Amino acid sequence: MHERSKPKTTGADQTCLEEEKETRGGLRNGSSSDTGGRERTDRGVSCSRRKNCEGQNLEPIGERDDQSSDDDPLLCDERSTIGRHGNADERPHQELAEGGIRMPGRGWWRGKMGNGVWYDFTRHGRGEDDAEGAENNATQQDADVCSGCKFESPREFRKGHRRCSSSTSGILLDREDGASGVPEVSFKERMEAEKKKLKELDDKIYKLRRRLRKMEYKKMGINREIDKLEDSVQ
């Protein structure tokens, strides 16, 4: 009998398989405490989120150790900047050199923005590190309703999208239920914005024409002076 070739598994799949084995082992040993139940639930959610994001062709970029600090050189290189906001106790967001945002948490998923820029996004779990600051950072509700880790460009700000309140670069979370606080830009408002841009362009053109006219007068005056000098020399 020929042995079937085993399918290739990603790092996320391997982690899920290991967690499932640990869960089964815990059930066989009869560990049914509160803490164990919560851990198993969180692991199940974590694996399902990974599969969901992999289905959207997003790139899993690793798993973070809970004991690692926010300034870990593995997470943030020398060119990156750390922006703090709110209370000093809140974990800072790490702004990557390539223009992305990495939020603290256990799992990161990389999604491509509508403007072609890659951003890293963390789904907040129910661990110790985000038990206190979940409401102040990207809230648990926002993280849960983020459907398939989809991202939109801040320029495509339309109804049904909610801006992540803790994001320093304005990442938009794709919400299926629609956000009450996000008004849809009307046709009239868009027309007014376009008219304003046209008016600004007209003003710039007018100023440039005035400068050009002054330069032409100056050139004519210089030419007259040259003619006078030539006449006097002759």
Curated annotation (Swiss-Prot):
Which stretches does the entry tag as region Disordered? 1-103
What domain of life is recorded for the organism?
Answer: Viruses
Q: How does it assemble?
A: Interacts with host HSC70.
- The entry's protein name is Matrix protein 1
Localized where? Virion; Host cytoplasm; Host nucleus
Organism this protein belongs to: Infectious salmon anemia virus (isolate Atlantic salmon/Norway/810/9/99)
Q: Provide a GO CC annotation, any one.
A: host cell nucleus
Residue ranges, compositional bias (Basic and acidic residues):
76-96
The record's function comment reads: May play a role in virus replication, from virus entry and uncoating to assembly and budding of the virus particle. Interaction of viral NEP with M1-Hsc70 is thought to promote nuclear export of the viral encapsidated genomes.
Keyword check for Magnesium:
no
**In this entry, which stretches build a coiled coil?**
183-234
Task: Recite the UniProt keywords alphabetically.
Answer: Coiled coil, Host cytoplasm, Host nucleus, Virion
Coarsely, its chief localization is: virion
